[in-house]
Amino acid sequence: IGKTAIVEGLAYRIKNNMVPNALFGYDLYKLNVTSLMGDYNVAGQSESRVDLLVKELASRQKTIVFIDETHLLVKGSSTASGMDFANMFKAGLDRGEIKMIGATTTEEYEQYILRDRAFLRRFQKVDVVEADRETTIKILMGTYPKLEKQIGVKLNYTDFIKEKIMAFIVDMTDEYKRVYEIASRYPDICLTILSNAFTYALFENSREVKMRHIYQAIANCKNVYEDSKKKDMARFKVEFADILREENTNLDEVI
C-alpha cells in the first residue's frame, strides 16, 4: 500500500533539500534483495555478494539503502541452506555504519522478522496504514500525469471532471471490495484500475482515455461473468451522469 512510494518521496525531499540538516547530502539506493541473494543453493556466492555489499555500505558516510521485502533477509536462515543474511548486517547497523530502510507486509513481518529479535531491535517499526478515500483520490490525481507521459494517452477533461472520475473509481472500488471481498487495499487497487484504463485506450489506438475505458477497468477488477461486467458498465454510466448533474455540470458528452 505504497511502501516504495514513501521512500521515493523521501528521496525527492532529500534531492530538493526538504529534509532536516542531518539528512542533507544523502544518497538513497534501492536494493533488489532477490537478485543479491540469488540461488540459495549457491551459498558461497550469495554470502560473498552480501559481504561485499555490507562492506561497501559501511564505507559510505552518507548513504541510505532501501530494501523492499526485508523479510527475505531473515527468511534465508529458515531455508535448507541455513544462510543468515540478516546476521551479516547486524554489526554494521549496530555501529551506525549502515543506514537502512526496510519494508515488508504485516504478514511477512509477523512470520519472519518477529522471530529474529536481534535483527528487529535495530529498526524503528513504522506501520503504513491503508489510505482513506480522500488520500486515495489525491494519489490518483497525482498519478495520472505520469501515466499520460508513460503511455502516451491523455485524460483530456477539466480538473473538476478529473477529480470526479477519481472519486468515482474509489467509490465503485469500495463497493466491489465490500460485496466481493476483494483483498487488495487502497491505493493499490485504484492505481491498477487507472493504469488499466489508460492501457485500454492505448489498445484501441485512442489518444484519449474515455469514460468507457474507466468503466471497463472498474468492471474488470472483479472476477465475474462478462454479462455481469456489461451490466455494471451500463450502471456506472448512469451513476456518473447523475453525479455530474448533481453538480450542475452540463457535460453529458463526458459520460
Regions found by a protein language model. Name each.
Residues 1-255:
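AAA+ P-loop NTPase nucleotide-binding core of proteostasis motors
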